[in-house]
Amino acid sequence: PYHHLAIHPYPVNLVARTQLPNGINIVIRPIRPEDADLEQNFTRQLSNEAKYFRFMSSIQELTPEMLTRFTQIDYHNEMALIAVTEDQHHEVELGVARYVINPDKRSCEFALVVADEWQRQGIGHKLMNHLMGIARDRGLERMEGEVLSNNFKMLDLMKSLYFQVTPYPEDNSIKQVVIDL
């Protein structure tokens, strides 16, 4: 019903509440423009390795342009989900997964990063499952991404989600990960 609008309304129906194995409650929800500070703080607190694995460069924080692009999204053509928990009545971002629809309109490219201290607790798995479900529901047929060959935790996660992992033809320091939705 909103296809005629330039900016689609916030997809409140995509908000999901879940619990980690350690009993901590988290919310997975689409990012909002007002999450800019949350996203910037999250990125700043990532280790240099996590930043490098996510951005494939050694950034310290998001530029204003990146922050705008990452938080003011067009929910029709892309999606960004954040995992948050409450800490003393403030939201804390634990991870973010996003996709952007490719020009072919049938596939999308994804990115994922989870805060260092929250890795190996199922957050990346939950974010990716939710993201893949949204992409599938929107008629996308394929999700793909690039992962550095030495990012073993991410490659393990991709395999556990049944992504095909293959060497990147032009660069052996990168693996291509693909799944048919």
PLM-predicted stretches and their roles:
Residues P1-L181:
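Long, contiguous binding/interaction regions
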